[in-house]
Each structure stands twice: as C-alpha cells, then as structure tokens.
C-alpha cells in the first residue's frame, strides 16, 4: 500500500541551516524578487487582469510553493503558459469563473499528489509538450502585436486568424513612438545578457523605457505612448480574502478548464524542478511538489490571484544567484510584497509597448523552435501529434489541444505496444537452445507430434496480441487435436488478453481441441487462477515446461 507522500523540502532544509546559507538565500531572494516584478505585471495584464493581481499571485503562490513544495529551489508565480487559458476563462466566465477554476485546479493538483501521479505526469509525451508550448508562444506573441506596435484600434478579435486579418487592416494605424519603444525594449532585453548576468534585461528595459517615455512626454510633447496608468487604476492595497459562491452548474462547466490548468501547472512545475535537480544535484519530491502547487492555487485566488506554477526562468535565476533552500523563495515573496506596498503606484508610468516587448521575448523563449524542428525529423506519428497539438492550441484553445493530444498519444502508444508483442507458430520442431521453460537441457530439439499445433507469444498479452493470435490460427489448414501455447516470454496479461484467451479456449473446446499452456510465470499464473482458468482447462493442461506440454499432447493424440 502506498504511503502518504508529503514531505516539504523546507523541513529538511532548515535542519542544518546556517548564517552563510541564509545570506546566500537572502541575496538570491532579493534578486529573484526584482526579476519577478516585471514578469508578474506583464503576465497579469496579458492574462486579462489588472497588474496588481499578477504581483499578488507571485507573492502568495510564491510563498506557499516555497514553504510547502517538494523542491529546494523552485520559485513559483504566474507564468506565460497560463496566459492563453486564463484569458479564455475570463472571456467566457468572468473573473469569478477564473477564481473558481483556479480553486478547482488546486484541488486537482492535491489529488494528483495524493494519488502519487507526480512521476507519471513527467512522462506525458514530448511532442505534446513541445506542441502546446510552441502553440502558447505563438498565441502570446499574437496577442501582443497591438501593444508592441501601438496600433490605434478599438478592439482585437479573440480568434487567432481574425486577429491577423485585423492587424493587416490596421498597418497604417501603427504609432511610430510606441513601436519604437516596443522594438527598443526587445533589443535591450535580447542584448542585456551580454553585459549583465545578474540584472535581468526585462527590468533594465522597463526602467530605461519608462524614464525615456516620461522625458518624451515632458519635453517633446509626445502623448501617444500608452502606459499602464492609461489602461488600469493601480492599487497598492492588499485585497481581503474572499471565497466565491459555488454552484453545481458552475463547477460542471469549469471542470475542463480547471483540469487543463492543473495538468499544465503540474507539467511545468515538475519540468522546472527536474531541470533544477540537474543543476544543484538534488532530487525533488514530485508528489509533495504537486500538493504544494495545489495549496498555492487554492490560496492565491482567495486573495484575488490567478493560477501559478513553478517558473523555470525564475528558478534558474535563484540557483545562479546562490539560492539553495526554500528560504530564498520566501524572501522573493517578501521582496515583492514590500515593492507592492510601497512602490506599486510607480507602475502606472510603465509603457504598454515595453511590457509587450517583454512578452515577445518570453514567447520567443517559450517557442522551443529548435525542439520543434528537431521533432519534425522524427517518425510520422510523433509529427502528427506535434502538429495537431500545435495547431489546435493556436486555432481553438489549450483545453482542446491537451485533450486531443493526449488521446492521440495514447492511441499511438497502444498501437506501438501492440507491435511489441509477437505471436508465431512453430511447425515441425522446437529449438531448445537458450530456452528457459524446459527441463532436459541435453536435447537440442523436440519434435511436434502430428495433430498438435504450437504457438509462442513473445511480449505482454494484451490488446493487439489477441488479434494476431486469431489471424495466425486461421492460417492452419487442418484442425488439430491439441493446441499448445508457450507463454514463457509473457511478462503479464491484462483483462483484454484474458478475455481473448478465454474465448480462444472456449472456441477450441467446442471444436474438440484441447488447449495446453506451457511456461506460464508466477504472475501470469496468478491472474489465470483468479479467473478460474485451471478449472476451464484442467490442472493437467497447465505445464511448467514445453517438454511436459508435449508429453501431455502425446497422451491426448495417442
């Protein structure tokens, strides 16, 4: 029986905690907090909520994920992966619908952890992950074109194709000043790593372009550059905790979006934790991480936040700056809280074009175009799943993409697994070289008596194997008296295989054919006995070795 698996890394991290580690965590937390600020604002606005909700998410979820998660260095908060799904939920269900969906996603994540699904989630097929991640990146870029170029247009359609049609129709409405701010911001962020490894390019771009826009407005009379303050009213007041009203109809309608948030959050957080493990030489606890993520996504919306998960970029920033325990993540949350309380009003001066530039760079990083092009050289089945997930993400939505992608991957997996099982007929004699289910090693071959058919199954006996078996039996011309089925290389049998084997035995008995099993291992034999196979065939027709099975066949045909 599986035990309850909730062991936050915070508990083990503080056992041997010392001043040197604390100072390293403090410095890392301070830097990560500063790095997280522009991203939290940008992700919040891009998701369709106010900028302070993005910061509140980073504060609340960041604290909980560090305190209760299964990774020592994971930094949590809003991420680009959620932009598409969050914006879609808000458009369809409103802010209250998003709050309920996030709460439900938190419950799902806790359930994943309690059911020990942490390891399984990491094995979601790579083409699906690349497909929807690349699709999200393209969608994020598409949503930022208007602000990046300062297009003077009243509204932007929600449909992907319609967006680009409208953009094409409004090329003459580009504001050159806003476009300049957006493109220069992209250039600053892209070139910043060459000059500074510690200070993030997004922060440099926001500071430089905010000051530049203030100067342009003050001394050059430029008023066309839109800022956060032009679109939102900024508040630095912490919201009260509120629980939304839940109805059964609302819950039913939000199951699919909530499950998408949970799956997406689980994948991203566990990928981030795995990458971090490789850098610091540690091993995260996947199930504890999922439970911590779940609690964070329950607490965050209660305080007005949006979905959160582990963020790879912020986690790596934490590691690169010396963070080695969850204390660094908690410090990062405290730094963001102080900025929120005392400096939030200054955010109103940040240009929207600059934030769009930040998200354009984020979308480029998410696109994974190298992985995408590499997968295009893989088998056609992988390419099909990749392209299907990608196009469903950008044309429809992420919920549909993940659902269809996983179904397709499961079908392909079933087909590939069925191909691993080989069923063959042995016609004249049995080669005992390197055999494992015979007693008389001094014989090299055993002859098959007349009136006896011998079949050998190599691999798991489940879906697919049964059909191969039936097709192969149909090729024999004469009806035998005995059918021997060698199962020495069958590691397990599932309910489908059991059903097929039982039907084959019943049909054989109706035709007057005796079925003899040979070389059944303990695990498979236990399944057969639970299904009363020894009564169906008779104990004497279940043999440990092929030579015993042939001896039994000789008795039956004599």
PLM feature segments, named:
Residues 1-427, 431-432:
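Transmembrane helical cores of multi-pass ion-transport proteins
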